[in-house]
Amino acid sequence: MNSLLMITACLALIGTVWAKEGYIVNYHDGCKYECYKLGDNDYCLRECKLRYGKGAGGYCYAFGCWCTHLYEQAVVWPLPKKRCNGK
């Protein structure tokens, strides 16, 4: 019984590690890509796929394009040492 519980816990942990998520960011100004149609959004899906590849997904969350199913080294908002609009 304990072995089954441990295996289940490990599988759940592995599932959370493999998929990175985050806001798509403009490298020049450090800002998130904005969107206004919350939820499923063709613009966000298209931009996430262009930046991160065919396997990425995307939708509008809190007026920013949120990308899913990213590779671990994917760069997402916030950029280190760079604030939006130079602030």
UniProtKB/Swiss-Prot annotation:
The cysteines joined by S-S bonds are: C31-C84, C35-C60, C44-C65, C48-C67
Instruction: List the record's Gene Ontology CC terms alphabetically.
Output: extracellular region
Q: What is its main location?
A: secreted
Key words, A-Z: Amidation, Disulfide bond, Ion channel impairing toxin, Neurotoxin, Secreted, Signal, Toxin, Voltage-gated sodium channel impairing toxin
Provide the protein's localization: Secreted
The LCN-type CS-alpha/beta domain sits at 20-85
Acetylation is among the record's keywords:
no
State one molecular function term (GO). Answer: toxin activity
An example GO BP is:
defense response
Q: Which PROSITE patterns match?
A: LCN_CSAB
Q: In which tissues is it expressed?
A: Expressed by the venom gland.
The PTM Asparagine amide maps to N85
Gene3D superfamilies in alphabetical order: Knottin, scorpion toxin-like (3.30.30.10)
Q: What's in the domain note?
A: Has the structural arrangement of an alpha-helix connected to antiparallel beta-sheets by disulfide bonds (CS-alpha/beta).
Sequence similarity: Belongs to the long (4 C-C) scorpion toxin superfamily. Sodium channel inhibitor family. Beta subfamily.
Purpose of the protein:
Beta toxins bind voltage-independently at site-4 of sodium channels (Nav) and shift the voltage of activation toward more negative potentials thereby affecting sodium channel activation and promoting spontaneous and repetitive firing.
UniProt protein name: Toxin Cll4
